[in-house]
Amino acid sequence: MNEAEGLRQRRPLRPQVITEDSPAQEAKEGSAYSSKVFRVTFLTLAASLAVPLLGATVLLDCPIDPQPISLKEPPLLTGVLEPNNKLQKAERLWENQLVGPESIVNIGDVLFTGTADGKILKIEDGEVQTVARIGHGPCGTPEDEPTCGRPLGIRVGPNNTLFVADAYYGLYEVNPGTGETKMLVSTKTLIEGQKLSFLNDLTVTQDGRKIYFTDSSSKWQRRDFLFLVMEGTDDGRLLEYDTVTKEVKVLMVGLRFPNGVQLSPAEDFVLVLETAMARIRRYYVSGLMKGGADMFVENMPGLPDNIRLSSSGGYWVAMPVVRPNPGFSMLDFLSEKPWIKRMIFKLLSQETVTKLLPKRSLVVELSETGSYRRSFHDPTGLTVPYVSEAHEHNGYLYLGSFRSPFICRLNLQHV
């Protein structure tokens, strides 16, 4: 072997260049490509949805002009307010024989209620009968309500006559025996320059002389109650009607959805449930504080509807919407976000939003000073949905509803 051949053999080998990708490299590049495709696809889809949605929210009219409402953090559901299933022990009565029995009274063992089809009904010996109706048909749709009529609050007067607040027609006295109706206050009458658009509840003195009643809004009618809650309109009032002089006086103004009302046992003050603010106001009608007002219960665990006396000297309050804590309260979340409310009602109807709200029900008993004595819950709302009132009679709570096709009855000895 000569020297040249030896040099050729000792020449170092050139490094080999690997041209095929390794499996790890392929996976990495494939993942990066897939991620890029996903991002592009997602952004394209989001843009395709956002553009028409944004256009809709800009171009569509919103039926409400919501104002920010400042609510305190809901009270903790502990102690007396701790959730339970006690309302689920209630039984349903007269199912599909009536609809929307908002308020309930009794004369002896005979029950009376007003319903969503404009009727005032009598329930005697288990039989449902029509006593009277204030409006006229057709009934059954929101568009029909103003002519059909909607009796809400109902009370018994000293001569066993019925006093009824019809949301659209006004304040009436009804003879439960003959069905004769007598108008006391018409919604067509301007009271201090403001119309009555949404009569709601009433409470009557023992001698029948004074009737205190709420007008929930001068802008919104009953069929638009959810607009009233979400907008936070503060045009509600508490009024007084004198059955002798026929005069109507305005006692309180600036209320956000005033709803149920109840005279105290001593008849020295009237409690007014301010639904949109989750609280109870007190207005003094006699004594040294006459004409004054203060807070009776603040920051309640739900939105209160009607209030009635309990046999222990306190008050029953029904709440069809609960503010769970711990938990998520949609109404509290939206309270200071008017822009979200606008978007919701540009895209969805009241009926759709109502169906989306949790059907959780709560009834509380308050002491004579406003402290919580006990609470009855239906966490699912399957037994007692849309509760509007708790009327105590003969050891039972009769539970009204503003839209359910039945009355629920709860035996107080079993809870």
UniProtKB/Swiss-Prot annotation:
GO terms for cellular component: cell surface; membrane. Residues 1-30 are annotated as: Disordered. The chain crosses the membrane at residues 40-60. Glycans are attached at residue 159. Residues 1-39 are cytoplasmic. It holds the Pfam family SSL_N. Its main location: membrane. It is found in: Membrane. Residues 61-412 are extracellular. One of its GO terms (molecular function) is arylesterase activity. Keywords: Glycoprotein, Membrane, Signal-anchor, Transmembrane, Transmembrane helix. The keyword Ligase does not apply. InterPro entries: 6-blade_b-propeller_TolB-like, Strictosidine_synth_cons-reg. Gene3D superfamilies: TolB, C-terminal domain (2.120.10.30). It is a single-pass type II membrane protein. PANTHER family: ADIPOCYTE PLASMA MEMBRANE-ASSOCIATED PROTEIN, STRICTOSIDINE SYNTHASE-RELATED. Belongs to the strictosidine synthase family. This is Adipocyte plasma membrane-associated protein. It comes from Gallus gallus (Chicken). The gene is APMAP.
